[in-house]
């Protein structure tokens, strides 16, 4: 049984949702955790990524 009626259980709709999301929500979805030295320096755990940012893919 579905817990939340506003979230689709269809796989293709779930995959499409971040691409069709508004920019202020997509910004939160497309974020990456910062390294430990940057985390200590700036006090920010994760940062929204932009074009030309370098990220390390750890899974997926």
From Swiss-Prot:
Does this entry carry the keyword Transmembrane? no
What's one GO BP annotation on this UniProt entry? translation
Q: Which InterPro entries does the annotation name?
A: Rib_uL2_dom2, Ribosomal_uL24_euk/arc, Translation_prot_SH3-like_sf
Q: Name one Pfam family in it.
A: Ribosomal_L26
Record field: compositional bias (Polar residues): 1-11
Instruction: Quote the cellular component terms of the Gene Ontology held in the record.
Output: large ribosomal subunit
Q: Which keywords accompany this UniProt record?
A: Ribonucleoprotein, Ribosomal protein
List GO molecular-function terms, semicolon-separated: structural constituent of ribosome
NCBIfam families linked to this entry: rplX_A_E
Q: What is this protein called?
A: Large ribosomal subunit protein uL24
Organism of origin:
Brugia pahangi
Where is the organism placed in the taxonomic lineage, from the top?
Eukaryota, Metazoa, Ecdysozoa, Nematoda, Chromadorea
């Amino acid at each position: 049984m579905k817990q939340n009626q506003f979230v689709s259980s269809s796989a293709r709709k779930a995959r499409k949702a971040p691409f069709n999301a508004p920019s202020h929500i997509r910004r939160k979805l497309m974020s990456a955790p910062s390294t430990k030295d940057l985390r200590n320096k700036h006090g920010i755990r994760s940062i929204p990524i932009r074009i030309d940012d370098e990220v390390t893919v750890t899974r997926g």
